[in-house]
């Protein structure tokens, strides 16, 4: 049961422990690509008719190459190494699911400035808070596949958590409702009597 508010800013030491574990196990690697380099790589892949999947060049850098990049002022961002195995789970809405993680890039978990993207703190918090159900929109199926691999890399058994992916809410025109676009909110629905 929920009985307290959790602030991620007070849990940074837990995230740091997870980062150390992922680095030690070889599942977190430094990348020095700039946004411009990544955009160029993405455009080249797309123009060749290939999916824009990161080529893991950061994974293959040697110590001398890393030192050289850092001496020019480059600061790494950190990517999680997906293991290429399909992520599988029983979805409470969609039934048995399998997602091929070879179809996506290794996700960035830590930005150049050292701040965390949503993915890592979310998994660490789910584990430490004993979350049992994750219910979200079906547009997050890819995130689930990634998070399952992070759960496993941190030594957590994914069966502890049940996933449910709901169809997205749409307006009458079929466009998805979005907070960012100022779409109809639950508050609006409640005020209209629904």
Regions found by a protein language model. Give the residues of each.
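Short, intrinsically disordered, charge-balanced linker/junction segments flanking boundaries
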Residues: 1, 191-194
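A glycine-rich helix N-cap at a beta->alpha junction
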Residues: 1-7
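Active-site cores that bind ATP or allylic diphosphates and position pyrophosphate for catalysis
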Residues: 8, 21-190
